[in-house]
């Protein structure tokens, strides 16, 4: 099979090294095929469904994927932990208070150090974790999102931080957490940059 050329769908195109006068290459092309999976490239990330083709789900296109004025940049992070631990962190609003605000000092804004009041909401396979903090004269509600099995979004860390009047703020990252083994996982994600208060009509009491 050295040097053989296959098409994206697994069909044999060329079999160099085989006798061109032999029937074997022709038979091989009709009976042998590599496994192949269709992919979707979107905003610098490649998505594949590796189950039975007839069960391929529709690609989920959430509103956060195409926001006017927001620039998305793909990135990858390797974690030396189980993938469930990463999902647990996104659904634990308290971790930002201690990890990013108290034990290691202020990493984002002072508002992160406040524990606040916690609420959790379940909508089918979607979960929301809300942390409502009082920051001086403001009330800041930060929401993190998990859609099973591995899609997460985190509330804004800078554009909306409880230090000024803001009625709406978009997520700071959009991320998929992929298990590698029991002790390692990879996050494939977009960092979201720009005016995260978009759309502006949300930034009013009426909106």
Locate each region found by the language model.
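C-terminal catalytic domain of Rieske-type non-heme iron oxygenases
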Residues: 45-47, 53-207
């Amino acid at each position: 099979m050295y040097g053989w050329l296959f098409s994206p769908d697994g069909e044999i195109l060329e079999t160099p090294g085989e006798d061109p006068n032999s029937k074997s290459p022709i038979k091989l092309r009709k009976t042998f095929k590599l496994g192949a999976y269709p992919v979707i490239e979107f905003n610098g990330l490649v998505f594949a469904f590796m189950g039975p083709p007839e069960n391929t789900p529709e690609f989920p296109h959430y509103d956060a994927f195409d926001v006017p004025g927001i620039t998305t940049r793909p990135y990858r992070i390797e974690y030396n932990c189980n993938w469930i631990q990463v999902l647990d962190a996104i659904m634990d609003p308290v971790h930002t208070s201690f990890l990013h605000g108290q034990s290691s000092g202020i990493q984002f804004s002072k508002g992160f150090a406040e524990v606040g009041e916690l609420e959790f909401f379940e909508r089918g396979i979607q979960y929301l974790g809300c942390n409502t903090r009082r920051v001086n004269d403001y009330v800041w509600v930060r929401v993190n999102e998990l859609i099973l099995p591995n899609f997460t979004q985190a509330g804004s860390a800078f554009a909306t931080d409880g230090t000024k009047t803001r009625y709406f703020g978009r997520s700071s990252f959009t991320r998929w957490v992929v298990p590698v083994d029991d002790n390692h996982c990879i996050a494939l994600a977009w960092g979201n940059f720009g005016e995260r208060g978009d759309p502006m009509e949300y930034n009013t009491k009426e909106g």
